[in-house]
Amino acid sequence: QVTIGEESYPLPKPFLVMATQNPVEQEGTYPLPEAQMDRFLLKVNLGYPTKSDELNIMRKQMSGTLEELSAVVSLEQIVRARGFIERIYMDEKIENYILDIVFATREPQNYQLGPLRNKISFGASPRGSIALAKAAKCHAFLRHRGFVTPDDVRAVAPAVLRHRIGLTYEAEAEELSTENIVTEILNTLMVP
């Protein structure tokens, strides 16, 4: 639901939001607060299109005729898929692996990652653990498996955590990225 003032409005189910983010360096853009960023399940970096893709984009835009879009999946199919994903099995060892990854963003010194302590200004919140578990289940679902593996967790960790970790000035001066931090955590922690 959405609440405006004292009035609440129910939202349809499923309710999905996809958003784009412009670089902060562009005029008129401002960074979202961490609490708002934390509400997004994933942050996927797309980069620029290839030259041929951009040529197609340019031609379609200039011709004034955009392709008719049709739904590739129905709302009912999304709801049904969500039900399947919720039932995907996650072993307690995988749950603890997820918690170790997230806790390593908060307390790196407790995970043989002491040097990261001066690089991370804040780590992932409990929403990060929940998001990592959900995304790992989705990854398993897309691979037609009824259970989560450590590889599922590792595959989605950068997209789930990159916007949930704050870098210190020291890390920024060294041109470290949150991807570097996540990679170091994944490469250091014991995989179950």
Where are these regions (language model features)?
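Canonical AAA+ ATPase core
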Residues: 1-88, 137-139
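Solvent-exposed alpha-helical segments within well-ordered globular domains of core cellular machineries
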Residues: 16-18, 34-38, 42, 52-60, ...
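Generic structural motif
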Residues: 49-51, 93, 172
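Conserved AAA+ ATPase small/helical "lid" subdomain
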Residues: 68-110, 114-129
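C-terminal engagement/docking regions of AAA+ P-loop ATPases
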Residues: 107-192
